């Protein structure tokens, strides 16, 4: 493994489309853990093409007493919205993400992530979604964003760019 990458990413073996058992498609770091560290438990497309994902808010997402850090909330929404395209068989990366925080998200509780595609033009997909409390449906946060479809060489290009940046810095200055 080099710079956080592994052979699965190098070969781009990411699973696209819905899993027959509703399992969550895991990123490289979560594959090593064997579960989604953001707490996604399952994911499925509904009859209208929208995505539903039950989530257990992890205790280690705690920011303030008993509530999730806003960064966790944004990351969970990014994952739910992005996985909507994965379940439809598209690889895209987040271009923009705007999050509206409505209520504090309680830790160690079940929430529901939902998302839907609201537009598509060229390589850009507009998606919106929300997190709600699973027990009551109370809105906790919502998001909208644009995802940009990429080819399977996306991560190779990212590594090349990072190597170019590293080459530009030269040796560390001495004290």
Regions found by a protein language model. Give the residues of each.
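HotDog/MaoC-like acyl-thioester-processing domains
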Residues: 1-19, 105-107, 118-175
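Catalytic strand-loop segment that frames the active site of acyl-thioester-processing enzymes
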Residues: 22-68
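A structural signal for short, well-ordered beta-strand segments
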Residues: 53-55, 97-101, 115, 129, ...
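Short beta-strand micro-motifs enriched in acidic
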Residues: 43-45, 116-120
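Short, conserved micro-motifs enriched in small and acidic residues
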Residues: 67-75
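Short acidic/polar alpha-helix capping motifs at helix-coil junctions
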Residues: 3-6, 21-24, 46-47, 60-65, ...
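A generic structural signal for short beta-strands and their flanking turns/coil linkers
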Residues: 23, 36, 49-53, 93-97, ...
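Hydrophobic beta-strand-centered segment that forms part of the acyl-chain substrate-binding groove
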Residues: 73, 79-112, 117
């Amino acid at each position: 493994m080099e710079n956080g990458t592994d052979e699965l990413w190098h070969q781009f073996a990411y699973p696209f489309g819905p899993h027959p058992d509703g399992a969550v498609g895991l990123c490289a770091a979560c594959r090593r853990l064997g579960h989604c560290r953001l707490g996604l438990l399952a994911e499925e497309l509904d009859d209208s093409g929208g995505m539903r994902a039950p989530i257990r808010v992890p205790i280690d997402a705690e920011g303030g007493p008993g509530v999730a850090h806003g960064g966790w909330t944004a990351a969970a929404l990014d994952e739910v919205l992005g996985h909507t395209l994965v379940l439809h068989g598209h690889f895209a990366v987040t271009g923009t993400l705007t999050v509206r925080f409505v209520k504090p998200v309680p830790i160690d509780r079940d929430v529901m992530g939902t998302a839907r595609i609201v537009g598509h033009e060229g390589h850009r997909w507009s998606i919106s979604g929300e997190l709600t409390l699973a027990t009551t449906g109370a809105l906790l946060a919502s998001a909208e964003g644009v995802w940009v479809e990429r080819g399977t060489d996306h991560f190779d290009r990212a590594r090349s760019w990072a190597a170019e940046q590293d080459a530009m810095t030269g040796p560390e200055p001495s004290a």
